[in-house]
Amino acid sequence: MSRRRGKVEPRHIEGDPKYNDKVISKFINCLMVDGKKSVAESVFYDALEVIAKKTGQDPFAVFQEALENAKPQVEVKSRRVGGVTYQVPIEVRPERRLALGIRWLIKYSRGRNEKSMKNKLAAEFMEAQKGTGSAIKKKEDIRKMADANKAFSHYRW
């Protein structure tokens, strides 16, 4: 149990150097491995260039739309009541929605079969923008599970 009183102040995060956007900065931080931020930045910006070449659209807009499509609305949490564990659907807080969307896009990008990470990331962004892709499938699976367990929504806390 947490012994902390009150709310924790959210950390201040600087915008990224190219677009001055905090969401991109957060995405790059999540993409980073072993503290190599410059590598993560180059992978991300190269992925945006790949998107611009392949689609001819604004890559920043494609990224934003892909992230918006990957964000979950609801999720399920386990709640134990009388020796039985129920999957209780709950609405996701905005900060957690962003974190989950970023996490899923990166996770399923890494699992793809393209040659380089920039191509994997670009392909996942383009698929997520269209409403397909593994990150969107994950979101839909969780939504379906929440719909199936709607009967237990009165067990919220």
UniProtKB/Swiss-Prot annotation:
One GO CC term on file: small ribosomal subunit
Alphabetical list of InterPro entries matching this protein: Ribosomal_uS7, Ribosomal_uS7_bac/org-type, Ribosomal_uS7_CS, Ribosomal_uS7_dom, Ribosomal_uS7_dom_sf
Record Pfam families: Ribosomal_S7
Cited CDD domains: uS7_Bacteria
GO molecular function term, any single one: structural constituent of ribosome
Gene3D superfamilies recorded: Ribosomal protein S7 domain
Domain of life from the UniProt record: Bacteria
Keywords from the named record: Ribonucleoprotein, Ribosomal protein, RNA-binding, rRNA-binding, tRNA-binding
Any one biological process term the GO annotation gives: translation
Family to which the UniProt record says this protein belongs: Belongs to the universal ribosomal protein uS7 family.
Assembly description: Part of the 30S ribosomal subunit. Contacts proteins S9 and S11.
Reported function: One of the primary rRNA binding proteins, it binds directly to 16S rRNA where it nucleates assembly of the head domain of the 30S subunit. Is located at the subunit interface close to the decoding center, probably blocks exit of the E-site tRNA.
Full protein name: Small ribosomal subunit protein uS7
Organism, as annotated: Leptospira biflexa serovar Patoc (strain Patoc 1 / ATCC 23582 / Paris)
